[in-house]
C-alpha cells in the first residue's frame, strides 16, 4: 500500500497530466529516445516535477526554505509531504531569478544501489552504485530515522556539508518487511551558514572533516580503513609480511 504522501503526489501528477499533457508531449518531441519505455519514464519524471510544484509551489516553498534554513522535517510538516519529496524539491530551486542552494541528492538501498541521483553541488556521484562507504548516506542505516550531518572532504580538497536519513517506503501489513532507503542531501561548505544542519558543526575545523572519495576504484586514499578494492590508477604495494584492516590497506600504502 502507498503512503498518504505518495497518494497525494500521484493525485497531483494526474492533475498535471490533465492540465499540461500537451505541453509535456510537445517538449518530449524534441528529443530522441531509444525506446518507448524510456520516453514514458521521462514523462513520468516531468509529471512528478509538476506534481511537486503543485504541492510545494516555488515561491512559497523557497521562502519557507530560507526562513527555516532548509530544515527538511519542518518543511515536511509545513507542506504535508514526505521527507524524500521535500529533499527532492529543494534540489529544484534553481530559477535564476530566485535561486536556492545548489544541492546534491541521492537515494540508496541497503545493498548500496543508487536509485536516484542529482548533483547540482558539483560532487561526483557514481551512476549505478559502489559509492564511497564513508558517505553518511550509508551510515544512516545504523540509526534509522535520525538525521546525520557531516562535513565531507573529497580528494580534490572540495568540502561538502552532507546530511542523510533513512525512510520507509509503503505501508505494509503486520509482519511484512518494509522497504528501507537512505536519502542523502548536501551542498558546498560555503553555503553552511544557510543550512540549519551545520549549527552544531564547525565547518572550518579540519578535525571534524570526514575524508571521502567517489568509489574505491577511483580513490587515492590508500590508508582508508574501509577500502574494499584497490585503485585502478595507482600502483598498489602488496606486503606479505604485514596485515592491516584489509589486504588493500597496509603501512606501506599509508605513507
Spans of features found by a protein language model:
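Conserved binding/catalytic microenvironments
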Residues: 1-222, 226-254
Amino acid at each position: 500500500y502507498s503512503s498518504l504522501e505518495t497518494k497525494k503526489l500521484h493525485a497531483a501528477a494526474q492533475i498535471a497530466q490533465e492540465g499540461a499533457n500537451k505541453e509535456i508531449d510537445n517538449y518530449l518531441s524534441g528529443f530522441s529516445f531509444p525506446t518507448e519505455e524510456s520516453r514514458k519514464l521521462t514523462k513520468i519524471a516531468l509529471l512528478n516535477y509538476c506534481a511537486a510544484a503543485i504541492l510545494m509551489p516555488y515561491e512559497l516553498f523557497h521562502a519557507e526554505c530560507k526562513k527555516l534554513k532548509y530544515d527538511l522535517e519542518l518543511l515536511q510538516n509545513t507542506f504535508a509531504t514526505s521527507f524524500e519529496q521535500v529533499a527532492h524539491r529543494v534540489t529544484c530551486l534553481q530559477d535564476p531569478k530566485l535561486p536556492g542552494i545548489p544541492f546534491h541528492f541521492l537515494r540508496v538501498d541497503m545493498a548500496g544501489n543508487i536509485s536516484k541521483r542529482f548533483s547540482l553541488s558539483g560532487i561526483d556521484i557514481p551512476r549505478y552504485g559502489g559509492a564511497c562507504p564513508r558517505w553518511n548516506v550509508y551510515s544512516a542505516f545504523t540509526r534509522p530515522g535520525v538525521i546525520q550531518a557531516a562535513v565531507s572532504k573529497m580528494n580534490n580538497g572540495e568540502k561538502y556539508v552532507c546530511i542523510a536519513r533513512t525512510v520507509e517506503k509503503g505501508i505494509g501489513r503486520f509482519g511484512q518487511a518494509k522497504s528501507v532507503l537512505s536519502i542523502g542531501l548536501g551542498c558546498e561548505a560555503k553555503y553552511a551558514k544557510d543550512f540549519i544542519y551545520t549549527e552544531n558543526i564547525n565547518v572550518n575545523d579540519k578535525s571534524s572533516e570526514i575524508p571521502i572519495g567517489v568509489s574505491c576504484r577511483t580513490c587515492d586514499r590508500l590508508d582508508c580503513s574501509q577500502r574494499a578494492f584497490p585503485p585502478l590508477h595507482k600502483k598498489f604495494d602488496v606486503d606479505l609480511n604485514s596485515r592491516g584492516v584489509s589486504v588493500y590497506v597496509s603501512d606501506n600504502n599509508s605513507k
